[in-house]
Amino acid sequence: MLNRSSKAADFPLAAAFGIYTAAFLAVASPWLLGFVEVPWDSVSTFYPPFAFLARSIATGQSPFWTPNIFAGWPQIADPQALIFSPLHLLVALIDPKPTPRLFDGLTFGLLYIGGAGVILLFRDRGWHAAAAVAAALAFSLGGSAASRIQHIGQLQSLVFLPLAILMLSRALEHSSWLAGAAAGLFASFIVLGRDQVALVGAYVLVGFVLWHWLDGPGRGARFVASLKPLIAGVVVGACIITVPVALTVLLAQSSNRPDITFAHAVQGSLHPASLLMLAFADVFGASDFHREFWGPPSIPWHELIGQTGLYDSQNTGQIYTGALVAVSLLAFTLTRGVLWAREVRFFTVAAAMTLLYAFGKYTPVFGLLYGYLPGVSLYRRPADATFVLCGLLAIVSGYLIHRLLTGTLPLRRWQTVVAVLAVAAMVAISIVLARWAGMLESAVLPLLWGCGFLLVAVGALVLARRLAPQSAAAAAFVLAIYCAADFAWNNAPNESTGLPSSMYGALRSDTDDETLVLLRAKLKASAAPDRRDRVEMIGVAYHFPNIGLIHDLDHLYGHNPLRLALFEDATGAPDTVAAVRGPFTPLLPSYRSPLEDLFGVRFLAFGQPIEKLDPSVKPDDFPLVGRTKDAYVYENPRALPRVLLATRWQQADFAAMLRNGGWPDVDYQRTVLLERAPAVAPNSETPGTVRIMLYENTDIEIESDAPSGGFVVLNDIWHPWWRASVDGKPADILKANVLFRAVVVPPGKHVVRFKFEPLSGGWAELRSKLHAAPN
């Protein structure tokens, strides 16, 4: 057990937080003041669901299902919906129309929490306040958290890790069930991310417990003493995560990604050459608007150095965690026993294991983990582990700085020689690679800047060491100023992290974007009691696919790596339609098809003329009704209403239709396709009427008047968590026309209600899967 109480009492906590806050705000100011916004996935994948969450709460609706994307989507099971993000949920409860700028503020709020947790962890361990501030800034403003700030869910999975470790450490050392419960709370916030960063973070916490049990004598006593706090933590965590995680697992099993093959996963490995960016932030040109990216797996690298077999974005390998981190690791890692000291040994091993995980196919370790460690096979891109890796490196380097500032780090001349040689080797490797790739001229300036920052970092450490005995706050101030300058320059807004706010006017609730204004006007003009027309927006802008979540437009597609397998099989929907929609399918062979009409796609906004996307369409098939600066807007005059009253039915093999296409030649306003005959099967020529009485996210009421009975067909995606009733009595929801919903109604006037019930529906689905599983 560490004796920390006296050292913690001497820790200038207020000064540390004040200095950390000032430096943090200085670096974050371009975003917080609204000059730039976090782009790409932040504005396309995460902000729209957040706006939908706030809008739903403000209008008294449940946010658990949305009709605005993919013909219907279970938000409650989607980690990107942010429903279970404590910070986002709190703000959504308060603000009905949160702006993108506020959303960026919450993003930096998450990062701030991560750094604050590091300071508290250092204080608890009796480590130097100046080292705590340096580590906190590296954790919150460096590494993958900075370069991949657009991935909001992964940030959330990371930032609570220091607080979880802090409370877990207290729980284990003091056998405190209160601390254990707090550890379970913060651990649950990590797991609620339900992504690979959450998985790696969870395993770090598991490893922390195992380390506590096994490290040193008295293992049995430690194990027994830990049971009470661990049980408290497990109970608290289980109460929070069980439902969201279970629903996400069920969604994944019915999605386009029920699992990830090893070959697919390792396409997202971290290339070893990316380690050069620990010291040289932009040696490969990954964040410079005016330079060509040449690192792995770019085109120059593949053409002139060799194929990598990787499929990563250019910012995946940007792991620059600050020059202080690089200097401390390069200069002091080889100091005998320092990183193996008991108080930091776990973090050293955890960082090493996380690095091996991130390397993916480049070591045998990931293959073993993929095969034997639960959860690993669910995710692609092991390089996502760099979020946790960089956070752990910030803590380890902070410990090294603590040892330096407290005079307990043995300093020898050979350490300086080794550090210089290490930097020289990294420079030499960078130059050789740049020459091979034909990018030497592009790499020289970043290398010079990197060497300059490393040199100044040495000076900052020397000055801080001199000031530390007299004033911990003064030493912290020196290191904070340096870190702020370092990150303000090397992690400044770039094409991956910060683009002008003026680019995203369409995201605002009061937008005057001409494409959206035109679509809204057309939809209003086409409104009818049985209609809720959909739109299709392809190739307009990166942030458009999910924009319906903000403005309550029902877009046929969206932006999400997950789609229901049924929907993807039917439509060929890709992750996003920001550029192109992807290939057509047998069931949807053209925009001129029965499925497009059944979806009720009335208006189509394309970034290029429709005939370029679908050469098979004829000029009169889709009249051009508008031309904006971003889109050609067409009308589909054949789009069917959202609700239909079919009085006839015809049997069809849906699986064969998905494979081969071939829609029967029937009138889909009067005839519904079913896989099997229902218990009561109306078949009449007598028409009826149907109208929408209520259409909310999770509650839909439809009034039908069928003299001879019939089928109320709702052209929303079929999903097992929906329930139906006719005049208040439970009714079966039939899968209709391959992927839609239908309910049998008897003769006369009736009210059909569709209700989304994820808890009972999810439980029923889970039970059916368990019963169907082999014994």
Predicted regions and their residues:
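Extracytoplasmic/lumenal acceptor-recognition loop(s) of multi-pass membrane glycoenzymes
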Residues: 476-601, 628, 633-680, 719, ...
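Active-site-proximal, structured, solvent-exposed surfaces of multi-pass membrane proteins
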Residues: 356, 546, 557, 668-775
